Amino acid sequence: MIIGAAGRDFHNFNVHFRGNQAYHVVAFTAAQIPNIAGRRYPTALAGPGYPDGIPIEPEADLERLIQGLHADVAVFSYSDVSHEHVMHLASRALSAGADFLLLGPRHTMLKARVPVIAVCAARTGSGKSQTTRRVAALLEERGIHPVVVRHPMPYGDIAQQAVQRFAVLSDLDHHHVTIEEREEYEPLLRAGRVVYAGVDYERILREAEREADVLLWDGGNNDMPFFVPDLLITVVDPHRADHAAHYHPGETVVRMADAIIINKVDTASPAEIATARRVVGELNPHATVIEAASPIFVEGGAVLRHKRVLVVEDGPTVTHGGMPYGAGWVAAKRYEAAEIVDPRSHAVGSIRDTYAAYPGTGPVLPAMGYGEEQVRELAETIRRTPADLVVIGTPVDLGKLVKLDKPSVRVRYELEELGEPSLTDVLGRFLETSALAEASTQGTQAQASVES
């Protein structure tokens, strides 16, 4: 049995269990993501050993499933959870009679034919996305064409989403993606990047590497990369510095990292930054440690002054990511909003359920939109919240997906390198020693020629 959340679990099955005569997978379980339990992993992806596919059941039924399906092994396969959470699940599996297993990189990472740079994080919401965008821009400046491969988010038709390629914004509509997927893909597409994602990452890898000088793995949650990285960059949030040593598999990617970015130093206290340095130094004393900021940009931000505002934040960050707020809340404070209106008492349906499931979420609205009904409930929650204005802290253009009955402003944020060593330095050293050195030199010379 594979204990999952519609991502890592499917990958682990595809690369380690599919076609493996030593195992027969009797079920997946689902957590974190709504509307996954009750479905089936399709035969088209499961292979000939599974003519009826594989059922996906609620994690809450773990003990009953292990005993009823006579599962010998429970394989933990999702991310962004505390070490304690993992061991509670282990105890549940063991008490039901099953072994408990974690699969490591040797069994789950695929080898690419082109260099791979992976961006991962200690926790969801640390700043992977803007780091990925910055790395892609630095590569492009050097004449190196990156193709981004994103950690899976197969929340629709699993078989149809086996291999997805996004090159223009209209591809998002073509693939019927959720708000959560748009949050990741839209900023990359606006920057001119090609993005691959889906379910079957062996097929995705072979497609993506055909059009890339380098593959740029854009991690999800705090998970390990699915491809063997030639350079692993892990982002740490100093607001949750101690989490780097207490969350799975974030601690793993901190320990594995070649470079560690301590992000958000512009909003963290000196004590928080010092704690982050101490923690990552203890876990990985050999990594290059970089400091970076996440400056916030709000077009027309002055309109927030003295207004009562509703803040909509990136959903994963303020739910299983454990942050009470995000960039939208910071922007509302910075631009002197009169009040950040608490939406929790106005929430309806699954949005209300989300607050119950994640009581650590602060007085902000997670941009949950895993299906049409949830998007409607999100819109209704916004309508019911008595505010003058909506502050959109999620990266997606929410106004195009949800009918807003209030004026809105969007918050944007990018990675800003601070001091030495820098991400530019780390990337430059990597390129000098990789097969990309010649292309990098030609690209740098061309850039210098343009600037002169």
Descriptions of predicted regions:
Residues 122-123:
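P-loop (Walker A) phosphate-binding loop of NTP-binding proteins
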Residues 67-69, 117-118, 130, 137-381, ...:
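Flexible phosphate-sensing "switch/lid" loops adjacent to ATP/NTP-binding sites
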Residues 126-127:
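Conserved glycine(s) of the Walker
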Residues 436-449:
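Intrinsically disordered, low-complexity terminal tails and inter-domain linkers enriched
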Residues 1-71, 339-352:
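A solvent-exposed beta-alpha-beta segment
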Residues 108-116:
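Phosphate-binding P-loop
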Residues 43-106, 375, 384-398, 402-403:
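Phosphate-bearing ligand-interacting subdomains
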